[in-house]
Amino acid sequence: MERFSLRFVLMMVSIILTSSICQAQLSPTFYDQSCRNALSKIRSSVRTAIARERRMAASLIRMHFHDCFVHGCDASILLEGTSTIESERDALPNFKSVRGFEVIDKAKSEVEKVCPGIVSCADIIAVAARDASEYVGGPKWAVKVGRRDSTAAFKALANSGELPGFKDTLDQLSGLFSKKGLNTRDLVALSGAHTIGQSQCFLFRDRLYENSSDIDAGFASTRKRRCPTVGGDGNLAALDLVTPNSFDNNYYKNLMQKKGLLVTDQVLFGSGASTDGIVSEYSKNRSKFAADFATAMIKMGNIEPLTGSNGEIRKICSFVN
């Protein structure tokens, strides 16, 4: 029995040490010697893309989220389908929804010109999300880099509840985020990414027409113009009508007025849960929201990264080597 206990303790120590080593291998200075121009190349590609289409900022932040929540931040979301790979792009939460792949491809090609085989696609996604936030007036943070790319995709996992559903309850959202090592404040802060971007009609139609007490009547009436009861499933609507292209704290002010577009937005405020206080705090203090958003993005970027000799550095982000 004592021998078994000792083996168990040693095994747990090994797991903890391995986890610590993985985190230690991620560093903001990871490419300082091997590819010092990497981050500037990525930044240039991102800024060019958002200057062309403002909506792309939200898309790049969302891509990072959808990558990290399915099997960790490993760029598995970028892989196209082949005879041996079922692409996450085709999973229900991502299909014709996640976008910005061409921006990542462009950034990768620019980096490859100066540092071939050095910078991972997973790191490019993470850096692009930060640069997108900064470009539209949001916070900037030091991205920890050193991730490697997966050699597989995880479509079945993406379809199995690893990503939030558009009708999830607060308890479901909190449970999902907790499973990823993120707390309630992280949930509310990361949801603030919906201060920019757009959503498709079919994702919020039911909320508009259910005549619920948690939606402002005037807001619902305005939104119905672009989202009829039948048809128009793909019609786009700004998540924040007031400042749709600026990364500010207006999203939280909207929630307090029952003007959250998605069910998963509005569940953050109005039920008397602990999230109410956080939403109220962010609505009054943009700087606090920005700081907490940056902290949460760093934490999210540390979800199960591949490091060391695990995975690979893809030559082309959409295919394994």
UniProtKB/Swiss-Prot annotation:
Cellular-component GO terms for this entry: extracellular region
Residues annotated for substrate binding in this entry: 164
GO BP annotations, alphabetical order: cellular response to hypoxia; hydrogen peroxide catabolic process; response to oxidative stress
First-listed, main subcellular location of the protein, grouped into a coarse class: secreted
Name of this protein: Peroxidase 5
Glycosylation sites: 211, 285
Keyword Signal: yes
Cysteines joined through disulfide linkages: 35-115, 68-73, 121-317, 201-227
Catalysed reactions, as listed in the record: 2 a phenolic donor + H2O2 = 2 a phenolic radical donor + 2 H2O
Cofactors: heme b; Ca(2+)
Signal sequence extent: 1-24
Alphabetical keyword list: Calcium, Disulfide bond, Glycoprotein, Heme, Iron, Metal-binding, Oxidoreductase, Peroxidase, Pyrrolidone carboxylic acid, Secreted, Signal
Residues noted as binding Ca(2+) 2 in the record, renumbered to the chain: 195, 240, 243, 248
Record's miscellaneous remark: There are 73 peroxidase genes in A.thaliana.
Entry's Gene Ontology molecular function annotations: heme binding; lactoperoxidase activity; metal ion binding
Localization (cell): Secreted
Free-text remark on how the cofactor is bound: Binds 1 heme b (iron(II)-protoporphyrin IX) group per subunit. Binds 2 calcium ions per subunit.
Similarity section: Belongs to the peroxidase family. Classical plant (class III) peroxidase subfamily.
EC number: 1.11.1.7
Pyrrolidone carboxylic acid: residues carrying this PTM: 25
Entries under PROSITE patterns matching the protein: PEROXIDASE_1 (PS00435), PEROXIDASE_2 (PS00436), PEROXIDASE_4 (PS50873)
CDD domains in the cross-refs: secretory_peroxidase
Pfam families reported in the protein's UniProt record: peroxidase
Enzyme class of the recorded protein, top EC level: oxidoreductase
Amino-acid positions noted as binding heme b in the UniProt annotation, renumbered to this chain: 194
